[in-house]
Amino acid sequence: MDKTQSSQGKCPVMHGANSAVASNNMDWWPKALNLDILHQHDKKTDPMDPKFNYREAFNSLDLAAVKRDLNALMTDSQDWWPADWGHYGGLMIRMAWHSAGTYRVADGRGGAGTGNQRFAPLNSWPDNANLDKARRLLWPIKKKYGNKLSWADLMILAGNVAYESMGLKTYGFAGGREDIWHPEKDIYWGSEKQWLAPTENPNSRYSGERDLENPLAAVMMGLIYVNPEGVDGKPDPLRTAQDVRVTFARMAMNDEETVALTAGGHTVGKCHGNGKAQDLGPEPEGEDLEAQGLGWLNKKGPGIGANAVTSGLEGAWTTYPTQWDNGYFHLLLNYDWELKKSPAGASQWEPINIKEEDKVVSVGDPNRKFNPIMTDADMAMKMDPEYRKISEKFYQDPAYFSEVFARAWFKLTHRDLGPKSRYLGPEVPNEDLLWQDPIPSVDYRLDASEIVDLKAKLLASGLSVSELVATAWDSARTFRGSDFRGGANGARIRLAPQKDWQANEPERLQKVLKVLTELQASLSKKVSIADLIVLGGAAAIEKAAHEAGVKVTVPFIPGRGDATQEMTDVESFAVLEPLHDAYRNWQKKDYVVQPEEMMLDRTQLMGLTAHEMTVLVGGMRVLGTNYGGTRHGVFTDKVGVLTNDFFVNLTDMAYNWKPAGSNLYQIVERKTGAVKWTASRVDLVFGSNSILRAYAEMYAQDDAKEKFVHDFVAAWTKVMNADRFDLA
């Protein structure tokens, strides 16, 4: 057999670029530090032109025209996926709900802000079954309005319009959600290896009695909220009520909002389980090429309309599922309910001895009627004492229920959009809401000479370089790019709860704030404390750079306001408390997760890259900003001077590194054995990890002294301005 014949039938593709075939570095070294979460969503994956500005594009959109098209869509039933009772409202609401419902308050990740429902794993979660059809129904509208309307905004707007088309007066709508172009790499959805894995399975998200792992909110892998059939699929409304309360609290919802959202979400639409789940094909990511991104296709028939299977439960919650009314509470509270099985075998609750007029007209045959149904979570609204009180109040006052729901729906769908300054469009409500973290606008300007004069006053105030830099950093480091909360704007570092956080060193903080407040009072011109905090850091860095022989001006744009305690929800802000800060070489206690992993997580939330992280850590060390003044990682004899000494000494082979305790190392001179410095894991990782070492070596070079300073200033400014949405 010749060479040509022997090669027939073999794959002609070199597999070096095929991630499905080749093992990657994390396969070989699973404990290695994975920096990928810092390198996602860059311009290489973004097809938009470099000058494209979504805010400008959205502001040119005729929102009223879009809403007219969406209203028309609601009742334009398509043969390939017919609308229940001729109305797509329930489907569109579920799509919007599940887009927003992945948000969790602990780390601000998830939510509706990026259009991530289009990508794996969310597009293939069991709880998102058949939402691929909802997005395909929306495609003609997305196609028509193009780049002026992101998928992320369209999905939420479609849910809003669906409610309006069925009679609810919504609270408002804001645009401004920009689409991503590939799945997020930073979101931890759980460690389970199978969908809907029960609690007792390995890698469970529960421990103890029923303690849900942080930062997760959903009870199972592949669910948005709770299991509709009960805890681990076993009906028990009171146990389910406990899950509901935890899950919704982790989405920043209280009991009243929880009941309103549960009832309002189930006032319209239906569950689908009129068939066999085993007849469904794979989810979208597991389907064949010809399915073109659709999943859950019925292999034994059309499986659409009255015969569709989604959750497995079958039926509507209310008598009139295409109109907004108070029917949910009428049925829930006025009937006794018993457990039944759906045609697909799912556990659901159905009323006993229901009146004919309260039954639901069949989707497929207007001459037939069926019982309404309730999930285990719905029954929790009746069985749990606190939920029951709220349900009865809503039942007795339908107008109040509608108002509470409209506000809770707005909160659900806008929670991760950030402060009101990021909201776009003509339907933005005028009211400032506490959960939006309001900040008063400023009414002053500072020219260049006034800024120079303020810097001089700050440097002459008696505060050290490290005190000024550390305070500015502490004020800004709370920013989360996940839900756009936190940051230096507002100067909430001087308010509860931040002023008392251990991470902020309250005693040192009060000393600095006292000096800044006295300086503010002495000025002839109005300047916010928020601006003074940031400007103090800038002045200190310029001084430290000058002493290192580098002249640099740290960019500063005034305009930050000072929030009041009344504008600050203490409980809501508690989730922003730092429990670790690699940049100041501190963690509250030892954790299961390694310090360097926590550093990556915080860095990603702040929107920084790996090289920005590197240069900031190196600069913060030599500026002497360590928590409590510790010397770990301070590889310099010139503390307070912005040199590249951290990197020079980290990469110097004259030293050896030895463990000296938990998260503690000694840097020893090879020749003498003398201990030169001490360090933590987050110091040494910049010499250990091959990628971070490459950055460290670059900054240690003899020609990098000025570059180091300028890169540090650029990264610093990025952190200080992360929440300046007025500058976008």
From Swiss-Prot:
InterPro entries assigned: Catalase_peroxidase (IPR000763), Haem_peroxidase (IPR002016), Haem_peroxidase_sf (IPR010255), Peroxidases_AS (IPR019794)
E.C. code: 1.11.1.21
Catalytic residues as annotated in Swiss-Prot or TrEMBL: 98
Cofactor: binding details: Binds 1 heme b (iron(II)-protoporphyrin IX) group per dimer.
One GO term describing the cellular component: cytosol
Reactions listed under catalytic activity: H2O2 + AH2 = A + 2 H2O; 2 H2O2 = O2 + 2 H2O
Cross-link entry Tryptophyl-tyrosyl-methioninium (Tyr-Met) (with W-97), positions: 225-251
Residues the record lists as binding heme b: 266
PANTHER family with a match to the protein in the record: CATALASE-PEROXIDASE (PTHR30555:SF6), HYDROPEROXIDASE I, BIFUNCTIONAL CATALASE-PEROXIDASE (PTHR30555)
Name the UniProt record assigns to this protein: Catalase-peroxidase 1
Gene from which this protein is expressed: katG1
